[in-house]
Amino acid sequence: LRELLCSGAIRRHQLGAKDLLTPTSYFTRGSRIGHRFMKRILTYQIEENTDIENFLRRKLGFSKKQISALKFRENGIRVNGSRRRVTEKLQQGDLLEILVEEEGKGSSQLIPAEGTVSVLYEDEDLMVVDKPAGILVHPSGGHYQDTLANQLMGYFQKRGETPVLRSIGRLDKDTSGAVLFAKTKLSAARLSKEREQGRYEKEYLALAEGYFGENSGEIHIPVGQVPGSHPIRMKPDSENGKEAHTYWKLEKQFPKAALLKLHI
């Protein structure tokens, strides 16, 4: 999973353009006193004929509200250096520039905490963090200052940054592995949409007791929550459980156990 997340395939999520060229970013004061806005120019090379609104909505995941804001923003949409309307056409080879503004209030509800943060990949839109076992991703009952999200806010506080931090998916407390975080509202919306569309895959490594006579296999057993369990635990439940599918592959066989790669 780490190799997948850190590969070039995820850096710009294959946006339907040749590449999302390195965006320029700078901070400036917003129109309201005391508020700071981050302005970024995002540049895309167009691969196929389409129109601007379709590209923004389908390829980049912009909402109606975000597209409407671009219409009235000075130089919000430029094609080959000239300002364009959202209804205009795009031709193969065009260079599309989008001026994005986001209020820099950050995830103010998160309390910054000390901790060692292992960053596997980071750019202006997202980051991939190696989560250790024994720590929650988000604050929840009884854990409001000792989660991975709290440690990340401490990490950014030291750098003088206040990102809008959103995790795309999560891992259970006792599970270690790579966790994907969005750093802006725009990237959070885009990544969440791609997750719903099934464009991300998770792979787990598990140590299982016993000898496996086959190199791969499938497990199809309904699972349900153990009543009253806290934290939540799951168990096989053929009557009330939800359908669950696990695909496993033998990575290495040991004398009394085996290392398996799991795809859920």
Predicted segments with their positions:
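RNA pseudouridine synthases
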Residues: S25-I264
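Charged/polar low-complexity intrinsically disordered segments
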Residues: K18-D19, R32
